[in-house]
Amino acid sequence: MLLLPLLLLAVIVPGGDNEDVFQGPTSFHVIQISTFANSTWAQNQGSGWLDNLQLYGWDSDPGTTIFLKPWSKGNFSDEEVTELEELFRVYLIGFTLEVQDHVSEFQLEYPFVIQDIAGCELHPGKAVESFLKGAFGGLDFVSIKNDSCAPVPEGGSMAQRFYELIIQYHAICDTIAKLLLETCPRYFLSVLDAGKAELQRQVKPEAWLSSGPTPGPGRLLLVCHVSGFYPKPVWVMWMRGEQEEPGTQQGDIMPNANWTWHLRATLDVAAGEAAGLSCRVKHSSLGDQDIVLYWGHPTSTGLIFVAIIVSSLILLICLALWFWRRWSYLTIL
C-alpha cells in the first residue's frame, strides 16, 4: 500500500512535469446487475468501467471476462486475472443462492433486481477512495466507503437485516475489504498507466449549428452541437460579441461509441435578436484556437455540400460538351 502514492504520482504527473495534468478518467468501478425472475432462474451481468468508458464485460455462461481494450488488464498477470475471475464466479454462485434462500425472510417478491457498484476513485488531493453500494429496486440499502460499512437509512428495516446478515460472514467481509482497499487501487492505477497513450490523447471537436423546436411565437431555439472530442472537459457557450449569454443551457456530456464525447448547448431567444449571436467552443485539443460559429452564417458542412454540388454540375457540363463535340465531329466525317 505504501507504493500507491508513488504509482499515483507516476501516472498523474508523467515525467515529473507538474504542468502536465492528467485529464483522463478519475474512477474505476464494477457494476453488477442480478435479475431474479423466480426461485429457479437468475441472471448476473457484470461490467468494468473507467468513468463512462467500458473496459470489459462479464460473460455469465462460461463465467469469463470479455476485455474490450488491449490494455484492459493493466499490469495484472494472466494468473492474477484468472484468480479474480474464479473469485467472481464463485461469488456470483454464492450470492445467487444466498439471495434465493432469504427471499421469504426479506419479504421479496419475484421478479426483482439487485444492483451493486464497487470501485475506487481519485480525488483532487490525489487520494484514492474505495466504495461499494448495493441497491434493491433502485433504492440503496448498504454502503461501504474505504473500511467503513453501514446500512443506508433510506433502505429501512431490509437494509438493517441485510447488514446484520453480511457481517456474520467474516471471510467474505475480509475478501471485500482486500479487493476494495488493495486490489482496486492497484488495478486502477495500473490500467491508467497501461492505457496512458489512449487515455491522454487529444481529439478535436466538431461543431455545427441548428434550430430546435420553436419555443413559442416569435422565438427561436438555437442549438450548438459539439461532438467527437476527447478528453471530456469542454466549455461551450452562446456569445454576443465577447459577452456570454446567461440563458445558455448546456446538456449533459454524453459518450460516443468511439470513446469520444458529445453535447449540445441551447439558447432560447426572440427571433429578432438572433443576429450577432455565436457559439464558442473551448477544448484542450484546440489550444488557443477556439471554435466560433456565427448564427446565420453558412456552416462548414453547408459549404462543403454546396461545393460538392457545384463541382458535380461543372463535371457533368464538361462531359456533356465533350460528348457533343465528339458526336459533331463524327457526324461531319
UniProtKB/Swiss-Prot annotation:
InterPro entries: Ig-like_dom (IPR007110), Ig-like_dom_sf (IPR036179), Ig-like_fold (IPR013783), Ig_C1-set (IPR003597), MHC_class-I_related (IPR050208), MHC_I-like_Ag-recog (IPR011161), MHC_I-like_Ag-recog_sf (IPR037055), MHC_I/II-like_Ag-recog (IPR011162)
GO terms, molecular function: endogenous lipid antigen binding; exogenous lipid antigen binding; lipopeptide binding
Residue pairs linked by disulfide bridges in the UniProt entry: C120-C184, C224-C279
Residue stretches making up the Ig-like domain: 185-295
Domain of life: Eukaryota
Membrane topology of this protein: Single-pass type I membrane protein
Pfam family, one: C1-set
SMART domains linked to this entry: IGc1
Alphabetized UniProt keyword annotations: Adaptive immunity, Cell membrane, Disulfide bond, Endosome, Glycoprotein, Immunity, Immunoglobulin domain, Lysosome, Membrane, Signal, Transmembrane, Transmembrane helix
Motif window: Internalization signal: 329-332
Signal peptide bounds: 1-18
Keyword check for Cell division: no
GO-annotated biological processes: adaptive immune response; antigen processing and presentation, endogenous lipid antigen via MHC class Ib; antigen processing and presentation, exogenous lipid antigen via MHC class Ib; positive regulation of T cell mediated cytotoxicity
Regions of this protein lying in the Cytoplasmic compartment: 324-333
Misc. remarks from the entry: During protein synthesis and maturation, CD1 family members bind endogenous lipids that are replaced by lipid or glycolipid antigens when the proteins are internalized and pass through endosomes or lysosomes, before trafficking back to the cell surface. Interaction with saposin C is required for the loading of bacterial lipid antigens onto CD1B in the lysosome.
Subunit-structure text: Heterodimer with B2M (beta-2-microglobulin). Interacts with saposin C.
Protein task: Antigen-presenting protein that binds self and non-self lipid and glycolipid antigens and presents them to T-cell receptors on natural killer T-cells.
Name used for this protein in its record: T-cell surface glycoprotein CD1b-1
Species in which this protein is naturally found: Ovis aries
